[in-house]
Design a protein with these regions (language model features):
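Receiver (REC) domain active-site loop signature in two-component systems and cognate sites
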Residues: 59
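Helix N-cap/capping motif at the beta->alpha junctions
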Residues: 34-43, 64
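Conserved acidic carboxylate
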Residues: 12
C-alpha cells in the first residue's frame, strides 16, 4: 500500500545510539528495524528489503565494510541507499565506504541528528 511507512534498517552495535535513531525515525513516520551486528543484519536483509540502511562500520562478527560489500554485490539489495554513521574518520575509510556504494557518510562525533534525519528523508523518498 502507498500509505505504508518506509522501512529503515539500523545496523549499529551501540544500543543507545541505535535506540536514539530508532525513536527519532519513528517520530518522523518511518518503520524501523534494528540489527546489532553485521551477521544479524545480513539475516534481516534476506527477510525484508528496506528503503534505506543506516550502517556502522566497526561491529562484531561481520564488519560494516563486509555488510556494505554484500549489499553492493547482491542484485536484490544493490539499489538500497546506505548511510554510514561511524567513528572511522580517516579519508581512506570514507573513500572505501563510498567505493563500496555508501551514499552518505556521517562521523559520529560530528553528527547532527537533524542533518542525518533530513538526509534519510531525501534518500528514502
Amino acid at each position: 500500500m502507498a500509505n505504508e511507512p518506509k522501512k529503515i534498517l539500523i545496523i549499529e552495535d551501540d544500543y543507545f545510539l541505535s535506540s536514539l535513531m530508532k525513536a527519532r525515525l519513528e517520530k518522523e513516520g518511518f518503520a524501523v528495524g534494528q540489527a546489532f551486528d553485521g551477521e544479524e543484519a545480513l539475516q534481516l536483509l534476506k527477510q525484508e528489503i528496506p528503503a534505506l540502511v543506516i550502517l556502522d562500520l566497526i561491529m562484531p562478527k561481520v564488519t560494516g565494510f563486509e555488510v556494505l560489500q554484500m549489499i553492493s554485490i547482491t542484485p536484490q539489495l544493490d539499489k538500497i541507499p546506505v548511510v554510514i554513521v561511524s567513528n572511522l574518520a580517516q579519508d581512506s575509510d570514507i573513500e572505501k565506504a563510498r567505493q563500496l556504494g555508501a551514499r552518505e557518510y556521517f562521523i559520529k562525533v560530528k553528527i547532527s541528528i537533524d542533518d542525518l534525519i533530513e538526509k534519510i528523508k531525501t534518500l528514502a523518498a
